[in-house]
Amino acid sequence: MSIRIKIDKLRQIVAYFSEFSEEVSINVDSTDELMYIFAALGGSVNIWAIIPLSASVFYRGAENIVFNLPVSKVKSCLCSFHNDAIIDIEPDLENNLVKLSSYHVVSVDCNKELMPIRTDTTICLSIDQKKSYVFNFHKYEEKCCGRTVIHLEWLLGFIKCISQHQHLAIMFKDDNIIMKTPGNTDAFSREYSMTECSQELQKFSFKIAISSLNKLRGFKKRVNVFETRIVMDNDDNILGMLFSDRVQSFKINIFMTFLD
């Protein structure tokens, strides 16, 4: 079982995720024809991308598969492949490896006769395959009890001014979401109107770590605004905030858990 992927698409993926993590877990769902890429950033923050299987990302297998990919290592070795290469990614779960391979054929004039010259490249990278994550992505799409749009640069500017604090209070009032620093002196408050806000949600308040919000800084060059949702599970437990956007050709989700 392996994934065949165009090098341009692979470059996008590793360039993006290597800013946040040295490795990611890849989960291929052959039934839904989707590939999920997941990284745990620490501080109760998870990030994942959803990529449809297509001509540029093709899965050669019938069963679902989960494996780890060392994105930092892959990023540094892609210069070994031709710019038009289609790369096979084949995990070796038993030996804690992942293999990248590709070939390229060029025609060379030999005594006025074109001769095909084939170049094969294979790279084996070590990575612990015994700690792959099977992440329940659908859990965070079951229910939404609040929705707004947050301008990333303005949010980053706001939290830069309050770096002396550890968390923000999150409250809901009159169909608005309010982010506020603790206390009443030298207090900062940011308020967003919401396109969706359940009446039940406005009875609650939460806390979110500023260190978690700071992890959005890695998106600054790629994202202008995030669709932001307050998500809950099927038992109506409020889970946290889900930031979503489409970056280049794939959808990105960042989930942050509310603090107790």
Curated annotation (Swiss-Prot):
This is Late transcription factor 1. Belongs to the chordopoxvirinae VLTF-1 family. It comes from the Viruses. One of its GO terms (biological process) is regulation of DNA-templated transcription. Induction: Expressed in the intermediate phase of the viral replicative cycle. Signal peptide: none annotated. Associates with RNA polymerase to initiate transcription from late gene promoters. The gene is OPG093. Interacts with the late transcription factors VLTF-2 and VLTF-3. Interacts with the late transcription elongation factor VLTF-4. Interacts with itself. Keywords: Activator, Late protein, Transcription, Transcription regulation.
